[in-house]
Curated annotation (Swiss-Prot):
One of its GO terms (molecular function) is zinc ion binding. Its EC number is 2.1.1.14. This is 5-methyltetrahydropteroyltriglutamate--homocysteine methyltransferase. It comes from Staphylococcus aureus (strain MSSA476). Catalyzes the transfer of a methyl group from 5-methyltetrahydrofolate to homocysteine resulting in methionine formation. L-homocysteine binds at residues 420-422, 473, 588. Zn(2+) binds at residues 630, 632, 654, 715.
Length: 742
């Protein structure tokens, strides 16, 4: 009888209660020493390794743990240091400065990791001298060995690493070839240290362009074969289907495939005989991106099918578990929903149950998980009927007519200024919210505090001279979780944190049932803020596409249906704000681009559904009500027409870290709606100069009609300190005032 093995691609860094985040931010704030930071993170890494060992994984990843981002780790490993940061010792402080910027230099670009909500730091190739310079991977592998952990090193592969990079005069192929001797050196050091195999992540090979990379991919892995290391390499792909026949022809020891998010194609390729049985198959059968418990019986059937076409089978999650929370152990959830959930730790338990069943004929754990899954499935979460047809999906008049009415009503100046929505969540804000949630203070005391904070920041905005104000979102812990707490059909966890970028953690709500608006969500705070000023105050909402993409979605209904349910709920809130006298309403869609499928054959339908959902949420307002939206930076070229089709009166886009790249996306489209391209980077504590903001404005006006252009920061200001915000916004307003005089 063929036995199976179990493995993992990566584990969450945050810790069960965000110990990782707290330690790093304490170090940045100079509250702990570097030695204390190192000890805390070493202890957390040890805890992660031993936890995975407890679930009897045959091999446990190292190299997934990082102080910020694994792509940035790889950049430092190979001395791919941005030119402005060169000449310094390559250490953790340099790593943090590249990621966050400092008073002298801007940070490197931050971009979504494929179609997830994780962000990586983009490697920069301008005037670099690649070499192996900081082999932290080897250190961490040796540390795992010291714990008697059977570990395998993890590194992003050369094809993916270079493709996710920017800058430099070399071609894509030349950059890959430059790195091959360096990868070889790293591989040899790991093999010499005892690595049985090395996990080489090449998710770029599941994208549309993967065929265009096949020649250089073959050349790269042929190089590793000639160097005598290829058989120790396992190429891992995830998030979509791969071209299996090509991958099987590469001279490596094993291949990892995603059998969850591949729409069934990878299994079809296996059954068609496209897999080279001399290799080990690493089968991603447990969903690494969602929190629902596996249909364990269906996974058994899948394993049986795979065993018929393989000689060596390793089962694993479909991707790194970085994208899900650590554990359910600390949650106190309603059993009706809780039984259907599985976080990172529970997913390891599912792997262990299958290993025991196949290798030891031990079905105790398997039977328990099977019964639990069946109990959850026997419940009904489809209880509501929806009348989608009765809601408008287009505005009453074209933009050219609407903008005249809006300008007459708002009376805004040339180059109007605004912010994206949130202001700093100080320790005091967080304490009051926690005290209120834990019933340590009364509703009245909390409401009084919120009103005082709103009033204080309305005055700050007026004193600075902004044109369209916001209430600051002090009542919100997160732009999606807040709505998850208030809309029917969502479940909010206590410790369900996942990493978004760097130390930024989010707690995605879980959509388990039909979504419904039952009462106003934001009206009281927005109306109060508007009562304090004659300037317009924006209502601030999160859009349906983003709420869905930044939640753990239910899987018993099509995405479009769930998305439209959310859209109807947001539409109710939009109309409630309008009825309360709010003249400008922002419905943010920062996650619209990141949800774009990796394969272009699915793009058109995704974008069509996204545009319709946004219009369901926003089109019922009167012409004189101005609808804004906001998006985070990514490669917008693929969706620029869909952005236009949203028909938002104003869109603001995070652009400063793109170093002007986004402007190119507007060269091929006559964008005739209002737009604000972020003029400074809010992810960095660095205060922009007046000259930098003026340059950003001038660059934008080369492509965008001045009468349509707004000036704003990149994103919400929640994570910045109060003085940083006031100083940066003052510079922004002064730059705009000077520009108006030209």
């Amino acid at each position: 009888m063929t036995t199976i093995k179990t493995s993992n691609l990566g584990f969450p860094r945050l810790g069960r209660k965000r110990e990782w985040k707290k330690a790093i931010e304490s170090y940045w704030a100079k509250k702990i020493s570097k030695e204390e930071l190192d000890q805390t993170l070493t202890d957390l890494h040890k805890e992660n390794l031993l936890l995975q060992k407890y679930y009897h994984l045959d091999s446990i990843p190292v190299g997934d743990f990082s102080l910020y981002d694994h792509i940035l780790d790889t950049s430092l490993l190979f001395n791919i240091i941005p030119e402005r940061f060169q000449g310094r010792t390559i250490d953790d402080d340099l790593l943090f400065d590249i990621a966050r910027g400092n008073k002298d230099h801007v940070a490197s670009a931050l971009i979504k990791w494929f179609n997830t909500n994780y962000h990586y730091i983009v490697p920069e190739w301008d005037n670099v001298e690649p070499k192996v310079s900081r082999n932290v991977l080897l250190d961490r592998f040796k540390y795992a060995q010291s714990l008697n952990v059977n570990a395998h090193p993890v590194i992003v592969g050369p094809i993916t690493f270079v493709k996710l990079s920017k800058g430099g005069h070399q071609t894509f192929e030349e950059k890959v070839k430059t790195l091959l001797p360096l990868y070889k050196e790293v591989f040899e050091s790991l093999i010499d240290a005892g690595a049985e195999y090395i996990q080489v992540d090449e998710p770029i090979l599941v994208t549309d362009d993967s065929e265009s990379y096949e020649n250089i991919t073959r050349e790269a892995y042929d190089y590793f074969e000639k160097a005598g290391v290829a058989k120790k390499l396992v190429i891992q792909t995830y998030f979509e289907r791969a071209h299996l026949k090509f991958l099987s022809s590469l001279p490596v020891g094993g291949l990892g495939l995603d059998f969850v998010h591949d729409n069934g194609y990878n299994l079809k390729q296996i059954e068609a005989g496209d897999f080279d049985k001399s290799k080990t198959l690493y089968a991603g059968i447990i969903d690494g991106r969602n929190v629902w418990a596996s249909d364990i019986e269906a996974k058994k059937v899948l394993i049986d099918k795979l065993l018929a076409h393989t000689n060596e089978l390793v089962i694993q999650p479909s991707s790194s578990l970085l994208h899900v929370p650590v554990s359910l152990d600390d949650e106190t959830l309603d059993t009706s929903v809780g039984e259907g959930l599985s976080f990172a730790t529970e997913k390891l338990d599912e792997l262990d149950a299958l290993r025991r069943l196949f290798n030891q004929n031990d079905s105790v754990k398997y039977d328990k998980l099977k019964a639990r899954y069946e109990r959850f499935q026997n419940q009904s979460f489809k209880n509501l009927d929806y009348d989608f047809e009765s809601v408008r999906t287009s505005r009453q008049s074209p933009f050219a007519q609407r903008i005249e009415q809006q300008q007459k009503r708002l009376n805004l100046p040339d180059l109007p200024t605004t912010t994206i929505g949130s202001f700093p969540q100080s320790r005091e804000v967080r304490k009051y919210r926690a005290d209120w949630k834990n019933k340590r203070i009364t509703d009245e005391a909390y409401e009084t505090f919120l009103k005082n904070e709103i009033a204080r920041w309305i005055k700050i905005q007026e004193d600075i001279g902004l044109d369209v104000l916001v209430h600051g979102e002090f009542e919100r812990n997160d732009m999606v979780e807040f709505f998850g707490e208030k809309l029917q059909g969502f479940l909010v966890t206590k410790f369900g944190w996942v990493q978004s970028y760097g130390s930024r953690a989010v707690k995605p709500p879980i959509i388990y049932g039909d979504v419904k608006w039952t009462a106003p969500l934001t009206v009281d705070e927005t109306v109060y803020a508007q009562s304090l000023t004659d300037k317009p105050v924006k209502g601030m909402l999160t859009g349906p596409v983003t709420i869905l993409n930044w939640s753990f979605e239910r899987v018993d209904l099509p995405r479009k249906v769930v998305q439209d349910q959310i859209a109807l709920a947001i539409n109710e809130e939009v109309l409630a704000l309008e009825a309360a006298g709010i003249k400008v309403i922002q419905v943010d869609e920062p996650a619209l681009r990141e949800g774009l499928p990796l394969r272009s054959e699915y793009h058109e339908q995704y974008l069509k559904d996204a545009v319709l959902s946004f219009k369901l949420a926003t089109s019922s307002v009167r012409d004189e009500t101005q609808i804004h939206t906001h998006m985070c930076y990514s490669q917008f070229g693929q969706i620029i027409h869909a952005i236009h089709d949203l028909d938002a009166d104003v869109i603001s886009i995070e652009t400063s870290r793109s170093h002007g790249d986004l402007i190119k996306d507007f060269e091929d489209i006559n964008y005739d709606l209002g737009i604000g391209l972020g003029v400074y980077d809010i992810h960095s504590p660095r205060i922009p100069t007046k000259e930098e903001i003026t340059t950003a404005i001038n660059r934008s006006l080369q492509q965008i009609d001045r009468s349509l252009f707004w000036v704003n920061p990149d994103c919400g200001l929640k994570t910045r300190k109060e003085e940083e915000v006031k100083d940066a916004l003052t510079v922004l307003v002064n730059a705009v005032k000077a520009k108006r005089q030209e």
